[in-house]
Amino acid sequence: MELPRAFGLLLHPTSLPGPYGVGVLGREARDFLRFLKEAGGRYWQVLPLGPTGYGDSPYQSFSAFAGNPYLIDLRPLAERGYVRLEDPGFPQGRVDYGLLYAWKWPALKEAFRGFKEKASPEEREAFAAFREREAWWLEDYALFMALKGAHGGLPWNRWPLPLRKREEKALREAKSALAEEVAFHAFTQWLFFRQWGALKAEAEALGIRIIGDMPIFVAEDSAEVWAHPEWFHLDEEGRPTVVAGVPPDYFSETGQRWGNPLYRWDVLEREGFSFWIRRLEKALELFHLVRIDHFRGFEAYWEIPASCPTAVEGRWVKAPGEKLFQKIQEVFGEVPVLAEDLGVITPEVEALRDRFGLPGMKVLQFAFDDGMENPFLPHNYPAHGRVVVYTGTHDNDTTLGWYRTATPHEKAFMARYLADWGITFREEEEVPWALMHLGMKSVARLAVYPVQDVLALGSEARMNYPGRPSGNWAWRLLPGELSPEHGARLRAMAEATERL
């Protein structure tokens, strides 16, 4: 896949500024798109948009297809008289997910009651048409969420056996008893997709493409695992027998045990990879390009026995990545995927990526810990430039935070390397812009930078600490924090490096 020479910014919608505790798909999102356009940017990258649960991670979602109701802008519904909005005193600059949960769900339910009382015939018709059109995933998701609520939030594999096993009589009775709750969860999805669709149309009108993010694995407690246990390695109780993760390495003696159930690739292949085709189809309704997290798992994945508390006991198991991407190519033509190819990357993984012409990733924070052979140093990027260069990702510290904890060797090497590229800095606060300049100067077709680096923020603005169970995903922009001066500086840098 060929990318234009361009740049973009990474900002998850929850991080947008505004009232009511979390960024939403409203005027602040449109303001950000206009800022990006003025700055000369052509891409907006987001994290996964699915509904989040315990831990608030976008990478552990209740659904592979649904959108996050937290992102719904309630102000248009308040203007229609469906809901009254009162800010309970949300903090500025951070998402308080406990407070958000306690406020937003009741507000959404009030909006649903208002909709039922006051909606026009056209709106009712539009909602009914959405439910019918999306029934192939929406029915399972809405019932899953309604049942979850009815069972105190318990994961599906701890529900009563007839519901766990999806016995026909139990499902029929649940749909009848919980019809209002099911309709409510369908309503939240209608609102989400309507608002996201309007935002995507605005991005397209401004010449901005949206890069989405898709986790390779799905969460154990998700509608898909409940509805299609045959796709996963589960026992009779519906619990995973083997789980996903990565092996021990330099950074972790015990590796990482993510806990996601692993696919039964033989079953998915027999079904023509229909789950993956539909997943990608849905993603491409939302985005123009899709970054797939942990791309190496399509070549081989680390399989950990579910009984093991760490990732040490795992083993590599081959996956049918080539067959899957051939099928994707048949269906979509060009494969609109960016490969997150970080971590344990073998020649086989590189061959799979290159066979389908998928752009990989380069992270500048990884470039300075050894010598000139480091593949993250820009002079080592492939001449075709089919890579996306980042200062850091959501899993990294901010660039200023990283620099403050870098070794003296890394700092000295970085300063020398930047000087070789004609880039100098005096204060540590200038380091994020120096690295952004380096990425812009490189042959990488696309450069994408976290907004925290545009603002030269420290570790207090870090989005995620991998392995830390709580306190992540909370950083937010303050109103007016991104200024026209930031935009002008980005535009000048893009113009000087031929990225406009």
From Swiss-Prot:
Name listed for the protein in its UniProt record: 4-alpha-glucanotransferase
Localization: Cytoplasm
The enzyme's E.C. designation: 2.4.1.25
Record's keyword terms, sorted: Carbohydrate metabolism, Cytoplasm, Glycosyltransferase, Transferase
Gene Ontology cellular component annotations, sorted alphabetically: cytoplasm
Taxonomic superkingdom: Bacteria
Reaction catalysis annotation: Transfers a segment of a (1->4)-alpha-D-glucan to a new position in an acceptor, which may be glucose or a (1->4)-alpha-D-glucan
Predominant subcellular localization, coarse grouping: cytoplasm
Family that this chain belongs to: Belongs to the disproportionating enzyme family.
Organism: Thermus thermophilus
InterPro entries the record matches: Glyco_hydro_77, Glycoside_hydrolase_SF
GO biological process: carbohydrate metabolic process
GO molecular function: 4-alpha-glucanotransferase activity
